[in-house]
Amino acid sequence: MSSIHWPVALVCILAGVHSSWAWSNTHPSPDQALILQQERERVLQEQVLPAAPDVRLPRQADVLADYPASEAPCFAIHELRMVGELAERFRWALAAADAVGRCLGAQGVNLAMKRVQNALIAQGYVTTRVLVTPQDLKPGVLTLTLIPGRIQSIRFAEPASWRARWSNALPARPGDVLNLRDIEQALENFKRVPTADADIQIEPAGADGKSDLVIAWKEILPIRLSLSLDDGGSDATGRYQGSATLSLDNLLTVNDLFYYSQGKDLFQHDPLGSKSRSLHYSLPLGYWQLGLTLNDYRYHQTIAGANEKYLYRGDSENSQLSLSRVVFRSQAHKTTLSLRAYQRKSRNFVEDTEIRLQHRQIAGWELGLNQRSYLGDATLDAGLNWRRGTAMLGALPAPEEETGSGGSRPSVATVDLSYNQPLQIGAQKLRINSQWRGQWSKGALVPQDRFVIGGRYTVRGFDGDLSLSSERGWLWRNELSWAMGPSGQELYLGLDLGRVSGAASALLIGRQLAGGAVGMRGSLFKRLSYDMFTAWPIQKPAGFQTGAASGFSLNIQF
């Protein structure tokens, strides 16, 4: 065997070992490195693109008493009707009156009208009015007249900036029926830009039933620079990782977001290292949102051959185009449907010789349904996603297809649940956060598509260099945090549990991990945020080696 083919053969042998368990710290793992990088990219996006504040405008409905037990005179009501412009569209509100079969006098008729009015307000139609015109109730028919509240004009409050745009943020247009849900969506679209803020006032217009929307929009310097440092990398590609991210907010003045990030290993010299780049752009279109994300990642390591050392390196590229729409929102619930198309490429080399066995190029789509519900002070998020690989965009068959241990067209279902509950005990402010994530697939999956546990982003208490992965699995992360007064610091305790199953798990040394963590996070000087923790394994398979699980992350914004 030639000297250049010897390390290629070695890496191929290691690839086979990896498919059955895990890579050691002394050899590069192409799949493990990419899985870790995908988690880091997700965390980066959460830091740079914080979730826009949820806007829930207060209701203005009156508190109503029940119908009077008896009125004199009163008229037996056998039918309830609605007339007026758009009466057919709003006829559903009549059910709130509960007037049919009752004997109503003046007080009861007025109460029936107010109940219908409250039903409209509860659905966000705060300027649409219901009236009772003079009529004869002897036939037993009560007729309510609807006057729809429409938007007459939309404008920015003075002084208005030339960078302010409402056309793609506000789902409604002049002439539309005014609804608070549209205004809430618009405010979320404005506030998704971290350097901008907005408020919308409803002002009466001259015409009956017409209102003007007046938008107060302001913006600070729309350029952000952030520097970050953490020890969340791996020993194989660099434990300490740093990144610099440039964000340009409202770049095209359509409430859009853009960032470019570049990262690399720090405090590390050959024989190993890594580099990454990320680019993201997204913009709202009323209830829609369009986004594009591009990432590439490179790592290298020098491995020892029989007589000399060889450079082993890996290159990967990820791209995704996403489209989402809020399909339902009310005072307490919001439902979003999303569609994502993705492509992933990865290649690995020894010196300049490509390892064909590790060449991957896959593509596919993912359909998602997400629900956010407000349960008093608590928030419950639920997500269901279905991912399917396809042959589009030049996708290649996976090397594992020859052995039946994976494929380039997987069908994978994932479920995400998150519960957040603030608590106050005396003067102490606490918060409970519980997250559950699961994955299911009937067929065999390649390593990058498998469910992975073990590490700071999954089950804490493990350094992440070794992990358990298989086609199916679940994990449960729990935190109890305590706000340390007004200092902006938070102390937290964590308890995590995870389990994998499926065909690939038959070759693992175990299937379940559990770990605990204690840490502190917060912000200092308004610009510096940090998170530092120490974690320990509670349950692990015999022979599952793991290093120290303490860690930190720092981020400073300018």
Regions found by a protein language model. Name each.
Residues 213, 244-246, 279, 321-323, ...:
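Membrane-embedded beta-strands of outer-membrane beta-barrel proteins
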Residues 229-233, 250, 262-268, 285, ...:
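Transmembrane beta-strands of outer-membrane beta-barrel pores
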Residues 246, 518-522, 527, 546-558:
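Outer-membrane beta-barrel "beta-signal"
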Residues 347-497, 501-503:
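C-terminal outer-membrane beta-barrel translocator/porin domains of Gram-negative envelope proteins
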